[in-house]
Amino acid sequence: MLLLLAEYLQQFHKGFAVFQYLTLRGILGVLTALSLALWLGPWMIRTLQIRQIGQAVRNDGPQSHLSKSGTPTMGGALILSAIAISTLLWADLTNRYVWVVLIVTLAFGAIGWVDDYRKVIEKNSRGLPSRWKYFWQSVFGLAAAIFLYKTAPTSVETTLIIPMLKDLAIPLGAGFIVLTYFVIVGSSNAVNLTDGLDGLAIMPTVMVGGALGIFCYLSGNVKFAEYLLIPYVPGAGELIVFCGALIGAGLGFLWFNTYPAQVFMGDVGALALGAALGTIAVIVRQEVVLFIMGGVFVMETLSVVIQVASFKLTGKRVFRMAPIHHHFELKGWPEPRVIVRFWIITVILVLIGLATLKLR
């Protein structure tokens, strides 16, 4: 929005041309979203408290979690508001990738909002039934996949790239739709499973989102893409503004979500942020790198799959409780220790993901 205004004002003063720079608008995206989250956060927390929109805590979980009962939830609406406003202000609104990521993020946020609403407001412990949740996730995930497939100008944008094997490119054809669906929906649910401790999900999301922003910037620049042997995706660089907004909104939310949390993001935030990461990774053809950098999300998801499969097949549980962060809590790890160690793991994995840029 402001980019269009700056382009108009260039005829009066050339200084407004500075807003053409992606890096500047990415930084402004961070600062705008961060400011909005910090400004609106206290008001949202008070509103949630007044409306008694509080988190219910499982009785079979760690006893330390009982004190969290009643903590305001659905704070993900704060994150999504800050991301949306910042992106609409600073991004090029003629760029199709910006709209795809933004719409997918808000659509999955809407699914999470309905789920949270039924749990908290309607006092329905099941929330949105799983079959309906996955149905709507599938609808929006497939819609995004089909749109990206149908509008791809070159086969590069539907080719699977393997890090460290950059000479190997696997044309997916219509299989791109299937892969994209699983990446978006899988990433959405993986972040949601991770969101069980104060700040546990949001900081890895911020770090992975920041790294994906770097991939977006490099993939959108033909010279960098050719030098690094990564897919050149025209227009992908504009997503650095969205990634910047995600970083700012995430850090602003973490200000209130850090241990002991004043607010939880709820499904409205977790499902949306996971879907955003998955969609961005698909656009820049870095699904495998997302799998690496989001290793904490993958680990949390696998722990649930293993736990359920083991119990159904043998009647025994592999972990004391799943997702795996609860397993470590029940082993006696204090909550802050689990959180920070998972953050450290994410830092290492993100660095490995970024290192694939130079590995041939």
Curated annotation (Swiss-Prot):
InterPro entries xrefs: Glycosyl_transferase_4, PNAcMuramoyl-5peptid_Trfase, PNAcMuramoyl-5peptid_Trfase_CS
Catalytic activity from the UniProt record: UDP-N-acetyl-alpha-D-muramoyl-L-alanyl-gamma-D-glutamyl-meso-2,6-diaminopimeloyl-D-alanyl-D-alanine + di-trans,octa-cis-undecaprenyl phosphate = di-trans,octa-cis-undecaprenyl diphospho-N-acetyl-alpha-D-muramoyl-L-alanyl-D-glutamyl-meso-2,6-diaminopimeloyl-D-alanyl-D-alanine + UMP
GO terms classed as biological process: cell division; cell wall organization; peptidoglycan biosynthetic process; regulation of cell shape
GO cellular component: plasma membrane
Assigned keywords, A-Z: Cell cycle, Cell division, Cell inner membrane, Cell membrane, Cell shape, Cell wall biogenesis/degradation, Magnesium, Membrane, Metal-binding, Peptidoglycan synthesis, Transferase, Transmembrane, Transmembrane helix
Biological or metabolic pathway of the protein: Cell wall biogenesis; peptidoglycan biosynthesis
HAMAP family reported for this sequence: MraY (MF_00038)
GO MF term set: metal ion binding; phospho-N-acetylmuramoyl-pentapeptide-transferase activity; UDP-N-acetylmuramoyl-L-alanyl-D-glutamyl-meso-2,6-diaminopimelyl-D-alanyl-D-alanine:undecaprenyl-phosphate transferase activity
Pfam families: Glycos_transf_4, MraY_sig1
Record has Cell inner membrane as a keyword: yes
Cofactor(s) named in the record: Mg(2+)
Principal EC category: transferase
Record's protein name: Phospho-N-acetylmuramoyl-pentapeptide-transferase
Transmembrane segments: 25-45, 73-93, 97-117, 134-154, 168-188, 199-219, 236-256, 263-283, 288-308, 338-358
Enzyme Commission number(s): 2.7.8.13
Family affiliation: Belongs to the glycosyltransferase 4 family. MraY subfamily.
Organism of this sequence: Pseudomonas entomophila (strain L48)
Compartments in which it is found: Cell inner membrane
